[in-house]
Regions:
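C-terminal-most transmembrane helix of multi-pass membrane proteins
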Residues: 2-7, 242-298
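Glycine-/small-residue-enriched transmembrane alpha-helix faces in small-molecule transporters
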Residues: 1-43, 80, 84-88, 131, ...
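Specific alpha-helical transmembrane segments that line the substrate/conduction pathway
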Residues: 43-53, 82, 90-118, 154, ...
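Membrane-interface interhelical linkers
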Residues: 1-20, 52-77, 118-123, 141-142, ...
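Hydrophobic transmembrane alpha-helices of multi-pass small-molecule transport proteins
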Residues: 77, 107, 121-140, 251, ...
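Juxtamembrane helix-entry segments on the extracytoplasmic side of multipass membrane proteins
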Residues: 10-14, 38-42, 46, 67-72, ...
Length: 298
């Protein structure tokens, strides 16, 4: 009975953490978009990675010398994914628009949700969530195949981000793995950040917006997602990520005074219904439920 109560409370905490990370991510995305005119997408991504590393490394102080080969490889891959995931999404938005870019990117967590669940309920919830995302974003057809390709790379990166975080969470205690990956990613982007600061000379407003994006869209979600994926299975996390377009729509309506039409509200209702069903309906034993169970040290 005690173990069941602990599992239930852990699941609730994981869901709340994932949703909190998603909210922070969308607030950070809004902040980062305000910096685009001053330093461009590449500059914003570089500053985001640098800010996240400047916060996490001194606080966490990861013991990198103690990491084994089995711990190092997912950390190194995650460091690459951090930058690729954000940069390709921003570049896709520039070429094909926000709606199509976000829809393409959501294919990543959707694939994780579909491939890591063995039940019909999980697959149906994922499909409903996908329909809701399309209703909100309303992607338009395009012949910009490079933009589509960038969106699909962002999708693959998001899927890899989920799976790598789950692996790191089972092999490295605390948030040392995330902090280490963030530091490596920052080193990779440091020359780019310096070059952009010298050549574009962004104003203070753009810098502050980029720094805000680094805190809200990188530091907080990176840690929150790692913690959440220790408490909930990857297929549920993938479905929960469909809440991102909903949060983006609400933030746009509140902060940017954007209007939500009937189709957008239908999309929001579909996503809320899919997430509610995923949380309440029995989902059986997902493929990832026992992954790494014998390796966890924390």
């Amino acid at each position: 009975m005690i173990n069941m109560q602990r599992a239930g409370s852990g699941r609730i905490a994981g869901i709340a953490t994932a949703l909190g990370g998603a909210l922070s991510n969308q607030l950070g995305a809004a902040s980062g978009s305000l910096a685009f005119p001053g330093m461009g997408p590449l500059g914003v991504v570089a500053v985001r990675q640098l800010v996240a590393a400047m916060i996490l490394l001194p606080v966490v102080r990861p013991r990198i010398r103690d990491l084994t080969r089995a711990q190092w490889w997912p950390v190194l891959l995650l460091a690459l994914v951090f930058g690729i995931m954000n940069l390709t999404l921003y570049l896709a938005v520039e070429r094909v628009g926000l709606g199509l870019a976000v829809t393409l990117e959501f294919c990543g967590p959707l694939a994780v949700a579909l491939l890591s669940t063995r039940t019909r309920n999980g697959a149906i919830c994922a499909a409903i969530a996908a329909a809701g995302v399309m209703a909100i974003t309303r992607p338009q057809p395009t012949t910009d195949y490079l933009g589509v390709g960038l969106g699909l790379i962002a999708a693959c990166s998001w899927a890899a981000y989920i799976l790598l975080n789950r692996t790191i969470g089972s092999r490295i205690p605390g948030v040392e793995g995330t902090a280490t990956a963030t530091g490596i990613s920052a080193v990779l982007f440091l020359p780019i950040g310096v070059w952009i600061l010298i050549t574009t000379r962004p104003d203070m407003f753009a810098l502050l917006c980029a720094v805000g994006a680094g805190v809200l869209a990188s530091t907080v979600p990176f840690v929150a997602d790692l913690i959440a994926l220790r408490k909930i299975p990857a297929h549920l996390f993938g479905i929960l990520m469909s809440i991102n377009p909903v949060l983006a729509a609400f933030i746009g309506a509140i902060l940017l005074h954007e209007e939500l039409g009937t189709i957008e509200w239908v999309g929001i209702a579909l996503i809320v219904a899919a997430n509610t069903a995923a949380l309440l309906l029995p989902s059986g034993t997902p493929r990832d439920a026992t992954a790494g169970a014998g390796q966890r040290r924390d």
